[in-house]
Amino acid sequence: MGIPADNLQSRAKASFDTRVSAAELALARGVVPSLANGEELLYRNPDPENGDPSFIVSFTKGLPHDDNGAIIDPDDFLAFVRAINSGDEKEIADLTLGPARDPDTGLPIWRSDLANSLELEVRGWENSSAGLTFDLEGPDAQSIAMPPAPVLTSPELIAEIAELYLMALGREIEFSEFDSPKNAEYIQFAIDQLNGLEWFNTPAMLGDPPAEIRRRRGEVTVGNLFRGILPGSEVGPYLSQYIIVGSKQIGSATGGNKTLVSPNAADEFDGEIAYGSITISQRVRIATPGRDFMTDLKVFLDVQDAADFRGFESYEPGARLIRTIRDLATWVHFDALYEAYLNACLILLANRVPFDPNIPFQQEDKLDNQDVFVNFGDAHVLSLVTEVATRALKAVRYQKFNIHRRLRPEATGGLISVNKIAAEKGESVFPEVDLAVEELEDILEKAEISNRKQNIADGDPDPDPSFLLPQAFAEGSPFHPSYGSGHAVVAGACVTILKAFFDSNFQIDQVFEVDKDEDKLVKSSFKGTLTVAGELNKLADNIAIGRNMAGVHYFSDQFESILLGEQVAIGILEEQSLTYGENFFFNLPKFDGTTIQI
């Protein structure tokens, strides 16, 4: 028996009205203006022949640069800005990309023997027009904003770049061994250097911008070194449980799980996650220890000129659970967008972590005669945790390309290195970083030793001094501006969905860490309490800071982008709530420590 036509029309009208209501809700949120920090205009110099470089703190990667790392022609950058703001494919295709080409071979003419010997091609800017795209759910990409990025001469920027150099110098340190005697010299050096900087040793002042106040970090200790500041990130082991543990497998009720656990593991399923009837491992490929990139000025300049070194990193045989700073940097090099959060969701579901008690149909089936799946169940959260990712990416792409256009840390390291070498000759090429060079003197000396060792290993028996920021990736940063971070905005959005669905206050009964010697999990000596929300927040910080550890993002990129992603996810949850017939709310603990109901 069919459904009467009148009922179908009524349903169609109700469906239309629901969509209109969602659109009206999105419109009612309003638009938050996006403001840059003013440096693009401050360092604009249309006449480079007078000796002042142009756009030195803007993202110019891909355009031709001079021997100091400044763009040769400011008009190239202005054309770049016009093209990305228009989104016109032809305008983008007509931009100057990379160096001059050899008239005979047609290949780019690189500065370094390495790039020329590999016959490298150029790489293009990544999705520069994505922020111009419209979406059909959640906040419009251009309706939410990030605050202005820290300026080049600020105490915050000096602290950020100091932290990145220190992370780079400690890439072989194990997360579980920060307090080990064997690492004491490096760890104490890092702590002392950071605590000696104004950003860490001076409290926020009345009248400071709110965004700066919320990013402000106090005294650095062994317990919070290189950690995030989201609620839970400073509690327990450095690594979130959800990036190292596994889950119960199918057949676990009859002992089927045991076949997947290594004989020497402390258990928690040995880092193996049930993905349906197959398993996926939390283990990561082992990047060659001590192998850093872009430590030579000519190679660095080639990368700024668009040399495509992707794929030229090297690895040890096998894989292991994340153990070192370099391991985490490797994890975030090739992760599949929402991988960490889908994995976390699979772990939470397989281990029967309860949903938020406010979500419908949480009683025993014998009481409400229903189980959850399409709505408020496994299928719902598995779909939604991935669905928010590209919406968040569009929002951050708009901030990256169309608003802030912040230079990557590798380029800041270039300014510092060039100026440090000039200072030793009594000169100053980029006086804007004179203070940074002075305050980072001890860190830069260690960086020079590390870079010299790397450059000798790369075949230069007598390398020139280099104070560049060592990169974990052969290609350096991705081909888009630094502020904000794609990894961080996705982290913020996906973790927000997970916290909305699962019982955030649920306590984790056993805490694990990765063994310092063997590829296995061991029970942690931590005696405090970890919660689902805290470990999900820590997961977001781990992934976002992993990009900092690789040398491709700053702390402010990571922190502000997580908050941006949260806004996207909240908007989607609000709009989708209009589609449900059940009367309920999501209870969401936000990244600022407050709790809201959706």
Curated annotation (Swiss-Prot):
Keywords: Metal-binding, Oxidoreductase, Peroxidase, Vanadium. Its EC number is 1.11.1.18. Changing H480A: Shows 4% of wild-type activity. This is Vanadium-dependent bromoperoxidase. Its cofactor is Ca(2+); vanadate. It catalyses: RH + Br(-) + H2O2 = RBr + 2 H2O. GO terms for molecular function: bromide peroxidase activity; metal ion binding. Ca(2+) binds at F361, Q363, D365, D368, Q370. The keyword ATP-binding does not apply. Gene3D superfamilies: Vanadium-containing Chloroperoxidase, domain 2. It comes from the Eukaryota. It is an enzyme of class 1 (oxidoreductase). Binds 1 Ca(2+) ion per subunit. The binding is important for enzyme stability. Vanadate binds at K400, R408, S485, G486, H487, R547, H553. Homododecamer. The active site is at H480, H487. It comes from Corallina officinalis. Belongs to the vanadium-dependent haloperoxidase family. CDD domains: PAP2_haloperoxidase (cd03398). Catalyzes the halogenation of organic substrates in the presence of hydrogen peroxide. Optimum pH is 6.0.
